[in-house]
């Protein structure tokens, strides 16, 4: 019988994802902290934090798992036209802090708001370790969309996105897929499957299959310049 594990502030190993609860789906552990080493240990094992403000830290590994193969995003003709018409600019790791802060702001008041100040500080620390990264969308000098996530070997674990203009977050996803494909990434972890992700081309993998792919790709290094702060051009 699966049971919930309780973590202390020592950097102990996580329990295996196979022991996660089925209800709620994927809840594996509670407690601990968001120290960069613990966070990286979590992603390395296919586990991520997700909890509401004023709640204890909750650690998840749902079954099934939503994933993309880089390049598999369904980009509609209307989105392609929109990107070309608006002449947006794109960048990598030029404004990570602003991206995560915008993600937090645009979620305020929504059910499931989880990008707390504690979460923001934790992922900003990961960014300093060159493990958390962002894609930015600009209209002139104004940041109008973006996303962020964590890179583990050839796997990119998406966390959240935002838009201040219509389609800007989808444009960020399209840029992410192109960037990951060009740097030989093999898998994008989109965490929890939903109809929106399915409409964009995400597939639902059994957790065991996802973990096997993660183990296959997580120790393979990518080019050192993949996440240097840079302007990038989208190809449609």
From Swiss-Prot:
InterPro entries: Acyl_CoA_acyltransferase (IPR016181), Leu/Phe-tRNA_Trfase (IPR004616), Leu/Phe-tRNA_Trfase_C (IPR042203), Leu/Phe-tRNA_Trfase_N (IPR042221). Its main location: cytoplasm. Pfam families: Leu_Phe_trans. HAMAP family: Leu_Phe_trans. NCBIfam families: aat (TIGR00667). PANTHER family: LEUCYL/PHENYLALANYL-TRNA--PROTEIN TRANSFERASE, LEUCYL_PHENYLALANYL-TRNA--PROTEIN TRANSFERASE. This is Leucyl/phenylalanyl-tRNA--protein transferase. The lineage of its organism: Bacteria, Pseudomonadati, Pseudomonadota, Gammaproteobacteria, Alteromonadales. The gene is aat.
